[in-house]
Structures are given as structure tokens and as C-alpha cells.
């Protein structure tokens, strides 16, 4: 679920940035998304959005699906491989958290979602 995703983000970036920092970033971080991603971090969010879209096609409610995971050496690790939905959603979130941790964060890309760059 989204709270667990927030925990994974903190795990992967060693607590350097809260998940709230990503809510209104670029064209894809936060609710919805459109246009061309503005940078690598926004591309991570687009990939995560697409992954959630695939989860919804599988009848998994990704925003509300709880799963089991742990933080091992600053890497989120999923434990729910037996449940198709839980495992899929956990993998989406873990991949995005790792992607966020590697991508540069550009403060100039906060709050641009309503601008023409995201049309």
C-alpha cells in the first residue's frame, strides 16, 4: 500500500528525503500523470504508474494492497512471493524506491504538473 511504499522510499534513500518530497514532482510523481517525463526521477514515477496500471489490470488494488517487506542494507526486499497481487505490487514499489534513490532530485521540477510541460 502507499504507506509501505513511503517506508520503502525511506529505506532506499537512507532517510535522506521523505516520500512527501515526491508527491508533486515532475509530470508523473503523485496522482496521475501525462506528457513526457521531465527527468530521470520523473521517469521512475512514470514506470511506477505503469506498473500500478498493470496491477489494476490483474484486479489488484495497488494503492491499498498490503504486503510483507523488509529493509536490508538500504534495499527494500519483498517477502510475499506466494501471493500474486501482494508480490506484484511489492515489486512495483521496491523497484520505484530503488529508482528514486539513484535519480537526481531537481527542486525546479516540483509543482510543474499543471504547466504545459506535462500536456
From Swiss-Prot:
It comes from the Eukaryota. Its EC number is 3.1.1.4. GO terms for cellular component: extracellular region. One of its GO terms (molecular function) is calcium ion binding. The active site is at 48, 93. GO terms for biological process: arachidonate secretion; lipid catabolic process; phospholipid metabolic process. Ca(2+) binds at residues 28, 30, 32, 49. Disulfide bonds join 11-71, 27-118, 29-45, 44-99, 51-92, 60-85, 78-90. Gene3D superfamilies: Phospholipase A2 domain. The keyword rRNA processing does not apply. It is an enzyme of class 3 (hydrolase). Binds 1 Ca(2+) ion. It is found in: Secreted. The keyword Translocase does not apply. It catalyses: a 1,2-diacyl-sn-glycero-3-phosphocholine + H2O = a 1-acyl-sn-glycero-3-phosphocholine + a fatty acid + H(+). PROSITE patterns: PA2_ASP, PA2_HIS. Its cofactor is Ca(2+). Snake venom phospholipase A2 (PLA2) that potently inhibits ADP-(IC(50)=10 nM) and collagen-induced (IC(50)=7 nM) platelet aggregation when tested on human whole blood. PLA2 catalyzes the calcium-dependent hydrolysis of the 2-acyl groups in 3-sn-phosphoglycerides. Belongs to the phospholipase A2 family. Group I subfamily. D49 sub-subfamily. This is Basic phospholipase A2 acanthin-1. It comes from Acanthophis antarcticus.
Amino acid at each position: 500500500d502507499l504507506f509501505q511504499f513511503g517506508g520503502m522510499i525511506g529505506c532506499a534513500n537512507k532517510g535522506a528525503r521523505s516520500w512527501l518530497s515526491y508527491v508533486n514532482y515532475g509530470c508523473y510523481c503523485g496522482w496521475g500523470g501525462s506528457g513526457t517525463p521531465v527527468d530521470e526521477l520523473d521517469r521512475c514515477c512514470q514506470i511506477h504508474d505503469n506498473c500500478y496500471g498493470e496491477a489494476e489490470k490483474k484486479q489488484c488494488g495497488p494503492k491499498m494492497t498490503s504486503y510483507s517487506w523488509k529493509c536490508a542494507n538500504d534495499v527494500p526486499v519483498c517477502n510475499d512471493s506466494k501471493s500474486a497481487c501482494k508480490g506484484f505490487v511489492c515489486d512495483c514499489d521496491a523497484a520505484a524506491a530503488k529508482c528514486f534513490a539513484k535519480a537526481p532530485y531537481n527542486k525546479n521540477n516540483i509543482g510543474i504538473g499543471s504547466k504545459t510541460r506535462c500536456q
